[in-house]
């Protein structure tokens, strides 16, 4: 005996209309087939809705355009018109703060973007701009929906334009938790932060097969565009997560340091600091080694200054010779930029300059004070550096500091040589408060290089060149390799005990809360891109 057919609701009655709505909601919620969901889970990936549930506060998600469907009839697409069209969009809260979100659904058309799909993303981005809340894009897509032709490409262009208009107005965060290929990669590239998952995320303009055909190069997905590649080599991403839950947790923590928009202050948990110097503070008095050639870990300095020693690092695997990230001082977010003597002696190179410049501009856009720790012997020498554009690309860091109007505090811990001294948040670029430790060496260059240039003939003509060089180097060090020449000219505002660093930063930030500074009227600057 066959099962009776499910009775369809009578949509001419109120009860029937309500039942019909429930049926449609059920269809929209389960737009992907059970088999597609199973395959997604088998890869260790979550579904679009599961990701939203993890990201947002429980019960806060409000979906938009749940019943949107594509209108294409090409190649039999009209036979398959799932609700939602392969992307879930809406708004909700993270830790009680409003955010907008879109989550691409790989279980529907492989997450491929079509016209209506793109319109949904554009609509939620416009909504975020209107309401002044961050937008988080969860990317897991096979790329453009080929069957819809140029309509798909047009949708990408509309998204890129919204990314650009929203830049510096609302925080934009991209979670790449699957493939993101072709033109689709440019949306995350424009956003403020990109988070990828190890062994799961892949981003590239052209895939391995096309590269093999065109250039003959053999490369796998992971090597070409995996999370490690984009975190350590290209600098496209800001964090490599172990799994999707880790990635989402990183985004939630990141949001806690960012304001909702450019007209808001970052979230603060005001707490008056105890300015008494502690034994922990005194550890900084011995952190810089006696030998100028011996490294130390700048992370230790950073953690001594921040509340509870908590430092939230960004781009930790990329350009490790410079450290960037967020922390709090008296419960208020600050951005940190610091040379890292443990890597390339803290030299600035192309990647470090661009990493720091982007970070400073992000902080400036979103009203986050920047604290800079300086220990830099100069720019990294090398033919490759010069040929790859260190002049133009290093200038980006100058531009970033010089146009920043947020509070800027700089602490010189040891070396500050040559042009790199100027570049690293110097008084000359507009820093508000410049401090130096007694161990600071602020000069055109180090003793050996200077003596070899200034006293080449004297050394050559002396009976004992080694003794003469050592004596002249000592004279140079005593005369110029200190913070006091700069202090005499007001280039540093104070020479302080290292153990007093947090106290000075706390007081400085208190005073700078009312800082008022504006740039000359202009359409925009012409940063040396």
Regions found by a protein language model. Name each.
Residues 1-529:
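Ligand-binding clefts of soluble mixed alpha/beta catalytic domains
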């Amino acid at each position: 005996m066959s099962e009776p057919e499910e009775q369809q609701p009578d949509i001419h009655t109120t009860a029937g209309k309500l039942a019909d709505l429930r049926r449609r909601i059920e269809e929209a919620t389960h737009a992907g087939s059970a088999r597609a969901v199973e395959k997604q889970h088998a890869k260790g990936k979550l579904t679009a809705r599961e990701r939203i549930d993890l990201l947002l506060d429980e019960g806060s998600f409000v979906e938009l355009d749940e019943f949107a469907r594509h209108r294409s009839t090409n190649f039999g697409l009209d036979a398959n018109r799932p609700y939602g069209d392969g992307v879930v969009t809406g708004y909700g809260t993270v830790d009680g703060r409003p955010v907008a979100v879109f989550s691409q659904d790989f279980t529907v058309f492989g997450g491929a973007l079509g016209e209506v799909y793109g319109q949904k993303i554009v609509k939620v981005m416009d909504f975020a701009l209107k309401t002044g809340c961050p937008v988080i894009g969860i990317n897991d897509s096979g790329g453009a929906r080929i069957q819809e032709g140029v309509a798909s490409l047009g949708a990408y262009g509309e998204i890129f334009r919204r990314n650009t208009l929203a830049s510096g107005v609302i925080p934009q965060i991209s979670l790449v938790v699957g493939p993101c290929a072709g033109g689709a990669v440019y949306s995350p590239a424009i956003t403020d932060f990109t988070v990828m998952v190890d062994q799961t995320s892949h981003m590239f303009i052209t895939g391995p097969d096309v590269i093999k055909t065109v250039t003959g190069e053999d490369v796998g997905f992971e090597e070409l565009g995996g999370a490690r590649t984009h975190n350590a080599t290209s600098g496209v991403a800001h964090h490599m997560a172990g799994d999707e839950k880790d990635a989402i947790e990183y985004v939630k923590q990141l949001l806690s340091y960012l304001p909702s928009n450019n007209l808001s202050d970052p979230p603060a948990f005001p707490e008056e600091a105890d300015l008494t110097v502690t034994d922990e503070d005194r550890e900084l008095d011995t952190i810089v080694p006696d030998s100028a050639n011996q490294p130390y870990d700048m992370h230790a300095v950073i953690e001594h200054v921040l509340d509870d020693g908590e430092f939230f690092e960004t781009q930790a695997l990329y350009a490790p010779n410079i450290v960037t990230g967020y922390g709090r001082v008296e419960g208020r977010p600050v951005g940190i930029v610091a040379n890292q003597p443990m890597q390339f002696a803290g030299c600035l190179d192309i990647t470090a300059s661009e990493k720091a410049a982007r970070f400073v501009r992000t902080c400036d856009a979103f009203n986050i004070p920047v604290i800079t720790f300086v220990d830099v012997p100069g720019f990294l020498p090398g033919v490759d550096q010069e040929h790859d554009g260190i002049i133009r690309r290093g200038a980006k860091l100058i531009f970033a500091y010089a146009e920043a109007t947020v509070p800027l505090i700089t602490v010189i811990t040891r070396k500050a040589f040559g042009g790199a001294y100027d570049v690293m948040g110097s008084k000359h670029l507009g820093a508000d408060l410049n401090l130096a430790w007694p161990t600071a060496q602020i000069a055109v260059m180090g003793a050996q290089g200077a003596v070899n240039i200034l006293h080449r003939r004297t050394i050559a003509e002396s009976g004992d060149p080694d003794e003469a060089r050592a004596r002249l180097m000592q004279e140079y060090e005593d005369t110029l390799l200190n913070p006091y020449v700069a202090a005499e000219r007001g280039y540093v505002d104070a020479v302080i005990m290292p153990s007093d660093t947090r106290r000075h930063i706390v007081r400085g930030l208190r005073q700078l809360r009312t800082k008022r500074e504006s740039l000359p009227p202009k359409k925009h600057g012409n940063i040396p891109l």
